[in-house]
Amino acid sequence: MKDRADAAARDRYAVAGHPVEHSRSPFIHARFAALTGEPIDYGRLPCPLDGFAATVSAFAASTGTGLGPARGCNVTVPFKFEAVALAAQLTPRAALAQAANTLRFDAEGWQADNTDGAGLVRDITVHAGVALQGATLLLVGAGGAAAGVLGPLLETGPQRLVLANRSPDRARTLVERHAALAALHGVTLEAAALDDCGDGYDIVVNATAASLAGATVPVTARVLRPGALALDMMYGPAAQGFLRWAAAHGAHGRDGLGMLVEQAAESFWFWRGVRPPTPAVLAELRAVIEGADT
């Protein structure tokens, strides 16, 4: 009877996307729950490409089988822009990004947040030990992933940030939306084409989906100064091509696993008001993934 009562007390969360079958978020949040004692259950919520809103709404209204109510979800590709439209209220960073990766099902209306940028900043500064303040930074891509991290990166005060994209017009639109924030923090913010984005950056972040498709790195090696940090938001096998490219050109390659864990911790805090410890979870997850790849 106690086990059944404990299950009924667990609030439900999920990761919503297409696809989500291989998502590591359930592992991460299960570890966060164990470390914090928070009573949650976290699963996967596959959404058809034309049915994101309906699927998430049905999940929010469901009661579950032997579990508590649905309280929120993470949102992954390709629905981060759609998630904004479902919310009654946006956090400032979700409003600026116009993309959300976290929904909270409050009784007075759904709340949307974007924790990607906070996760990336913490991974770079804490886990990689690289300072963003005063650095020169190239952010490659202008889709939902880039939109989610641009604001938090600007808030750290880099000297210069260039947003490079296959379509420069799309990059310019994102730059214009963030111009006031860049000015507030004294950052030179520019848009550029992939083949004309400068050289010698301290930090290069790949926010494109090129790695997922097995495509080559969309910029030339001249963007890397010797010893630069080169980070791909992907992880596991998808990131290996980028990491090999970085190493071959004298850069320190890093995948997106630390960002994944840190954005999850930020989501957990948004939902529960508790900030879980992350170093042990990151180490455990990396061991699991590297073990699966051997």
Curated annotation (Swiss-Prot):
EC number: 1.1.1.25
Annotated residues for binding of NADP(+): G141, A142, G143, G144, A145, M233, G256
Pathway involvement of the protein, from the record: Metabolic intermediate biosynthesis; chorismate biosynthesis; chorismate from D-erythrose 4-phosphate and phosphoenolpyruvate: step 4/7
Gene Ontology CC terms: cytosol
Reactions performed catalytically: shikimate + NADP(+) = 3-dehydroshikimate + NADPH + H(+)
InterPro entries according to UniProt: Aminoacid_DH-like_N_sf (IPR046346), NAD(P)-bd_dom_sf (IPR036291), SDH_C (IPR041121), Shikimate_DH (IPR011342), Shikimate_DH-bd_N (IPR013708), Shikimate_DH_fam (IPR022893), Shikm_DH/Glu-tRNA_Rdtase (IPR006151)
Active-site residues annotated for this sequence: K80
GO biological process per UniProt: amino acid biosynthetic process; aromatic amino acid family biosynthetic process; chorismate biosynthetic process; shikimate metabolic process
Residues involved in shikimate binding: S23, R24, S25, T76, N101, D116, Y235
Record Gene3D superfamilies: Leucine Dehydrogenase, chain A, domain 1 (3.40.50.10860), NAD(P)-binding Rossmann-like Domain (3.40.50.720)
Superkingdom as given in the UniProt entry: Bacteria
Keyword terms: Amino-acid biosynthesis, Aromatic amino acid biosynthesis, NADP, Oxidoreductase
GO molecular function, one term: shikimate 3-dehydrogenase (NADP+) activity
NCBIfam families on file: aroE, PRK00258.1-2
Family (UniProt): Belongs to the shikimate dehydrogenase family.
UniProt cross-references to HAMAP family, sorted A to Z: Shikimate_DH_AroE
Function: Involved in the biosynthesis of the chorismate, which leads to the biosynthesis of aromatic amino acids. Catalyzes the reversible NADPH linked reduction of 3-dehydroshikimate (DHSA) to yield shikimate (SA).
Subunit structure: Homodimer.
Name of the featured protein: Shikimate dehydrogenase (NADP(+))
Species the sequence originates in: Methylibium petroleiphilum (strain ATCC BAA-1232 / LMG 22953 / PM1)
